[in-house]
UniProtKB/Swiss-Prot annotation:
Stretches with biased composition (Polar residues): 165-174
InterPro entries assigned: Rrt14
Cellular location(s): Nucleus, Nucleolus
Protein name as annotated: Regulator of rDNA transcription 14
Species assigned in the record: Candida glabrata (strain ATCC 2001 / BCRC 20586 / JCM 3761 / NBRC 0622 / NRRL Y-65 / CBS 138) (Yeast)
Alphabetic keyword roster: Nucleus, Transcription, Transcription regulation
Location, primary (coarse class): nucleus
Record function comment: Involved in ribosome biogenesis, probably through modulation of rDNA transcription.
Ranges of Acidic residues composition bias in the record: 193-202
UniProt keyword Transcription regulation, yes or no: yes
Record region (Disordered): 145-202
Family affiliation: Belongs to the RRT14 family.
Basic residues bias locations: 153-164
GO CC annotation: nucleolus
Length: 202
């Protein structure tokens, strides 16, 4: 049998030859045994498993919290939407009452017009049933007719005011209009000359 010292010397010699001929080549080890990974103790394995389990539990808790948060948000959103719809219905009832009584303010009319425009856009984008469309179009036509009538009344009032103002102007004797046909303001009348005017003055 070959001694350990002679084996070690032989491997050193081979390694030096390899290093001189092939720089960067891997050195040969003296033992034929495979290099095994260091064994992990059982306590370490248990510790690693516990850590993994804790991570998974934390992840599950995080996911559960996220689900709960989403559910809370959705219920809150639904509640807000329901409240908003109730407010809108109440507003519309009040506006209908005002419209029937004829006491709509400018703000309320503008709101109704805006609502009608919005709803027509929705109608165009949605594919509603015929009954719903007919109902909506009737309501819209009614609102538009009411607003047109009120604007006609306003314009007729304005016209009447203007007529009255013009009549008071023409009837008053203080304001007189001295105009001659075919003249530019500031020029003498057609039949008169400057000499005639001066002789009239003297």
């Amino acid at each position: 049998m070959v001694s350990k010292n002679s084996k070690m010397q032989a491997t050193l010699a081979v390694n030096s030859v390899l290093a001189s001929l092939l720089p960067g080549a891997a050195a040969i080890t003296g033992s034929n045994k495979k290099v095994s990974k260091p064994r992990v103790a059982k306590a370490q394995l248990i510790d690693m498993n516990l850590k993994k389990r804790l991570e998974l539990q934390e992840k599950d808790v995080y996911l559960e919290k996220r689900k709960e948060k989403r559910a809370r948000k959705s219920t809150l959103r639904k509640r807000r939407e329901e409240e908003f719809e109730m407010e809108q219905k109440a507003k519309l009832q009040i506006l209908n009452k005002h419209r029937e009584q004829g006491t709509l303010t400018q703000k309320e009319k503008a709101y109704l017009d805006e609502l009608a425009k919005r709803n027509t856009k929705k109608l165009k984008s949605w594919d509603l049933e015929d009954d719903v469309k007919e109902d909506f179009l009737e309501i819209q036509a009614q609102i538009l007719n009411d607003t047109k009538e009120s604007s006609k009344r306003r314009s007729s009032k304005k016209k009447n005011k203007n007529k009255g103002f013009k009549q008071t102007l023409s009837s008053s004797s203080k304001v007189q209009d001295h105009r001659y046909p075919g003249l530019t303001p500031g020029l003498a009348p057609v039949g008169l000359s400057d000499e005639e005017e001066s002789s009239d003055d003297e």
